[in-house]
């Protein structure tokens, strides 16, 4: 796996973004950028420089599930790996994320 891949971390809670960033850094992934919701993430994604997306589900503006659907509907972004890191632990939500095309789902 390319340790220089550019990873976008999307979460409205800055402490959670920092925790994820630190965990990634500990694994050797230091090329990260941040956004506080789906709406602010889209321009970053559209820049074409992101290799991996980590997103929360519950955020103001555009939620993580809506961001995931946006990514999967976009011809240039649809193959982007997406990991959802969220407090949403209900079976229905995990199924919804899987059906929307998430690559991984971690309950925080």
Residue ranges of model-derived segments:
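Receiver (REC) domain active-site loop signature in two-component systems and cognate sites
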Residues: 59
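Acidic, metal-coordinating helix/loop segments flanking the phosphotransfer/catalytic sites
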Residues: 34-52
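A Lys-centered signature of the CheY-like receiver
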Residues: 70, 108
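Two-component/phosphorelay signaling modules centered on CheY-like receiver
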Residues: 14-33
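Active-site T/S-Asp motif of two-component receiver
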Residues: 54-56
């Amino acid at each position: 796996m390319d340790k220089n891949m550019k990873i976008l971390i999307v979460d409205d809670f800055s402490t959670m973004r920092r925790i994820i960033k630190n965990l990634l850094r500990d694994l050797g992934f230091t090329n990260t950028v941040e956004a506080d919701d789906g709406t602010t993430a889209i321009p970053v994604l559209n820049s074409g420089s992101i290799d991996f997306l980590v997103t929360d589900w519950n955020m103001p503006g555009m939620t993580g599930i809506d961001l995931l659907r946006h990514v999967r509907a976009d011809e240039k972004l649809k193959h982007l790996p997406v990991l959802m890191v969220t407090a949403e632990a209900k079976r229905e939500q995990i199924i919804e994320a899987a059906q929307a095309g998430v690559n991984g789902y971690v309950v925080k």
